[in-house]
């Protein structure tokens, strides 16, 4: 399994990579890529950590599983490649940004530009079998990504965590809310967006918090 991450993550994660659970996870993932169609492409599994360094992280947006459709997942939660049709949840995210900040909906759903500004687009599970949502859950990824959240909470100051939906909100227990901002709402999926995602103004709230603490806001 290729672990491509920005250098500033390495002091915090090298110990994690050597733990027995991660070695078992890596063996499982390697075998899965050999025998099945797995997303994202192997070289993009750690894309979130390659594009958004530990030092640069300002905002964390937590997803659950990578997209499981053809060529959708690119290693960033909610993001898709430029040539791929935007999934409904991502369309709703852009609709909320348009309502909140007045930014027009972009022509593609590649969120690389967010990651490069310090938005860690983190799925709880980093791989999935094609057309089998949840197929790589409970194999060790959640242990790893929970550790990421805990490390960020412990070692960083004034982060914004966006927790959308019940699954993501369960991760709040890992976050020190006395020194970070946690924003919670319904999930942006079409089944839930009308129950509190639309109108949550998370993007303007995040930027106001960053500016308040002397940090550059995100160009959403």
UniProtKB/Swiss-Prot annotation:
Top-level EC class: hydrolase
E.C. code: 3.2.2.27
Locations listed in the record: Cytoplasm
Reactions the enzyme catalyzes: Hydrolyzes single-stranded DNA or mismatched double-stranded DNA and polynucleotides, releasing free uracil
Active-site residues annotated for this sequence: 65
Gene Ontology MF term list: uracil DNA N-glycosylase activity
Top-level taxon: Bacteria
Keyword Hydrolase recorded: yes
Main localization (coarse): cytoplasm
NCBIfam families cross-referenced by the UniProt entry: PRK05254.1-1, PRK05254.1-2, PRK05254.1-4, PRK05254.1-5, ung
Function, as annotated: Excises uracil residues from the DNA which can arise as a result of misincorporation of dUMP residues by DNA polymerase or due to deamination of cytosine.
Protein name, as recorded: Uracil-DNA glycosylase
Source organism of the structure: Amoebophilus asiaticus (strain 5a2)
Top-level taxonomy: Bacteria, Pseudomonadati, Bacteroidota, Cytophagia, Cytophagales
